[in-house]
UniProtKB/Swiss-Prot annotation:
Gene that this polypeptide is encoded by: rlmM
GO molecular function: S-adenosylmethionine-dependent methyltransferase activity
Signal sequence segment: none
Active-site residues, record numbering mapped to chain: 307
GO biological process, one term: rRNA processing
Subunit structure comment from the entry: Monomer.
Pfam families attached to this UniProt entry: FtsJ (PF01728), RlmM_FDX (PF18125), RLMM_N (PF21239)
Assigned protein family: Belongs to the class I-like SAM-binding methyltransferase superfamily. RNA methyltransferase RlmE family. RlmM subfamily.
The protein's name in its UniProt record: Ribosomal RNA large subunit methyltransferase M
Organism: Yersinia enterocolitica serotype O:8 / biotype 1B (strain NCTC 13174 / 8081)
Protein location: Cytoplasm
EC number: 2.1.1.186
Length: 368
């Protein structure tokens, strides 16, 4: 019975992922219950009605899920797959369920234990793909516009089999973008901002919204991991931090370093497009800082991190996003708000806010 959905998430954030999908499902009047195993890297949500699982992965916008890396319909757990023929039972599960899917992904959860299965998954992929093409479960060639077949192994002989829709899923294997750490970047945090650009900004809009010559501000910049990404895109950056910036960034001539507390700095320029911020501080304090920048029209788009407490993490994120939405609306500002726990995030989520227009005349950003 395909009345379940599986969601991949960061290990340790299963409860948050479960709370989020339960909330989203209830908003669609879809009811069920989540099965959570701590530190497993995935969550199962079982719907009471058979057809609701498919409806859920169609109607819950994947881009709005904060803690889920992938979302798919799955059937019952296939157990004790025979070592001499693991392919046939998997193909049998999909017969009559999926036709001419565009891609096959044989995956595991993102945990140290599961990673030991990755070599096995790669080895199984080719014979499985061939068998699925023979049975017309997969199309003869990969097609990005067709559903994706997922074979999700939780142990060597146990897997869930299912599908996702290519217009409402993560395009990445295991839901993880493969980014390479640049050897000249001052810190690994640079990958957070690079991933955020991939997740929040459509590729066909990069030229317009991540354009050469733009002005940007990085609050809490040192040593310059996030500034590095802006410099690489030929932006002019105001780096705000009492600490030291990497000399390699200063040598570019694109960075002006202000030794000021990020919470106290106020810009003198009126043409700042990007604000980025990765400061270790309570979420509500960072949220209020970003709201101040947006309400004053000091920037057009912002990407920032919210460091999460040990408990009530889903509630804290929800409250802060609601706070942004409410206060911007109170000030006559329409904005597009997104949030995601990125692969390169740890105990935090990354938020993106884009001002669409202002109902209050004379704001700085209306003069862009």
């Amino acid at each position: 019975m395909n009345n379940k959905i599986a969601l991949y998430c960061r290990s340790g954030f299963e409860k948050e992922c479960a709370a989020e999908i339960t909330t989203k499902a209830a908003q669609l009047e879809i009811f069920g219950f989540a099965r959570v195993k701590e530190n497993s890297g995935y969550v199962l949500f079982e719907c009471y009605q058979l057809e609701d699982a498919d409806r859920l992965i169609r109607e819950v916008p994947f881009r709005e899920l904060i803690f889920a890396r992938q979302m798919m319909v799955v059937g019952e757990l296939l157990k004790d797959l025979p070592p001499e023929d693991r392919v046939s039972p998997i193909v049998g599960m999909l017969t009559g369920v999926v036709e001419k899917a565009g891609e096959l992904r044989v995956e595991v959860a993102d945990t140290n234990e599961s990673k030991e299965l990755l070599k096995f998954c790669r080895k199984l992929t080719v014979p499985l793909r061939n068998a699925m093409r023979e049975q017309k479960i997969l199309s003869a060639r990969e097609n990005p516009h067709r559903p994706v077949v997922h074979v999700f192994f939780i142990a060597s002989g146990c897997c869930y089999v299912g599908y996702s829709y290519s217009n409402n899923n993560s395009p990445f294997y295991m839901g993880i973008p493969r980014l390479k750490f640049p050897s000249d970047a001052p810190s690994r945090s640079t990958l957070k901002l690079e991933e955020a650009f991939h997740v929040f900004i459509p590729a066909d809009e990069w030229e317009e919204r991540l354009a050469s010559g733009m002005h940007a501000v990085d609050l809490g910049a040192c040593p310059g991991g996030w500034t590095y990404q802006l410099v690489q895109r030929s932006m002019m950056v105001q780096a705000i931090d009492n600490g030291l910036m990497a000399q390699s960034l200063m040598d570019t001539g694109q960075v002006t370093h202000h030794r000021v507390d990020g919470f106290k700095y106020e810009p003198t320029r009126s043409n700042i497009y990007w604000l980025v911020c990765d400061m270790v501080e309570k979420p509500a304090k960072v949220t209020q800082l970003i709201i101040k920048w947006l309400v004053n029209g000091w920037c057009r788009e912002a990407i920032f991190n919210l460091k999460l407490p040990m408990k009530k993490r889903f509630e804290v994120v929800s409250e802060n996003l609601e706070m942004i939405d409410e206060q911007l609306k109170e000030n006559g500002i329409n904005a597009h708000i997104q949030a995601k726990q990125l692969y390169h995030d740890r105990e935090e989520v990354t938020v993106h806010v884009r001002r669409i227009w202002s109902g209050v005349p004379g704001r700085r950003d209306e003069r862009f």
